[in-house]
Amino acid sequence: MDQTYVKALESYEYLFGLADLSDFDSRMKFQKTTYLLKVLGIDFSGLKFTWFRRGPYCFDLVGVKYKPKPAHSVLRADEIIKIDQNKPLIHELMDKPRDAELYSSIAFLQREEKLSPEQIIHRMGLVKPWFEQRDVEAGIHKMKQILPAN
């Protein structure tokens, strides 16, 4: 079994407690949190995120809740420290599913597709019209302050 999927679930549960991934919003929050943790430097080698309707999505994370887990932690000490350092930020950004979608989508478009702020605003207006332009602009500003440089 690949430990990367287990690490994603363990990281999520370290942040938010026991994962209940039985509904759409909780699964979306898990996906978006895992992507943000990857961007912040947690080693999720092997997890490939693609653009999906609600932002970054990894097909390999589907059903991870039901895969067997090892008896020991797969998170390294340095990764736990990194998660602890970013815990308040992650909770702020990922608390609500709508926010998780907004911030992770902006991060994906900045980092993976290398879009400029103007291009992100345009793309989000096309594919996610439920977000107002001012929300996208504020999200871009916030993500610029917290994301590590490419």
Positions of the model-derived regions?
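Domain-edge interaction signal
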Residues: 1-150
